[in-house]
């Protein structure tokens, strides 16, 4: 990951789990980056890249997408991610984040408020369920 120069963020379930919210397990790590960053990930993890990839939810999301099948967990990289809201494509950007050490790497994770904003933007059933879990756990600790 040292070869990746573009900004990148862990989003989705992994970021929620890393924010100490108990939502269960996840089967992959979602990475949000730029289109250039997506190319850097493809070079860095080329031996693990899934070929002939078919994506789901193409009517909701578009990006420079790659999936990498690593021994312990899959990594999905979305470069220049956009979400379709009311027929218009909106860029998915992270504006507020914190950094966390993971092994020898420092990773960027959106703040919990930012994760909630992104989940609302995505608006799928699983996103709304995660929002409810976050709200429930925040109430327990406040």
Regions found by a protein language model. Name each.
Residues 1-142:
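Compositionally biased terminal segments of proteins
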């Amino acid at each position: 990951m040292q070869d990746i120069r573009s900004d990148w963020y862990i989003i989705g379930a992994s970021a929620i789990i890393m924010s100490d919210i108990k939502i269960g397990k996840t089967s992959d790590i979602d990475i949000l980056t730029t289109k250039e960053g997506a190319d850097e990930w493809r070079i860095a993890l080329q031996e693990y890249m899934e070929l002939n990839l078919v994506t789901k939810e193409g009517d909701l999301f578009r990006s420079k997408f790659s999936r990498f099948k690593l021994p312990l967990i899959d990594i999905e990289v979305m470069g220049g991610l956009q979400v379709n809201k009311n027929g218009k494509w909106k860029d998915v950007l992270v504006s507020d984040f914190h950094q966390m050490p993971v092994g020898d790497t420092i990773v960027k994770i959106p703040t919990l408020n930012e994760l909630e904003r992104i989940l609302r933007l995505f608006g799928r059933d699983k996103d709304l369920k995660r929002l409810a879990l976050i709200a429930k756990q925040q109430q327990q600790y406040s």
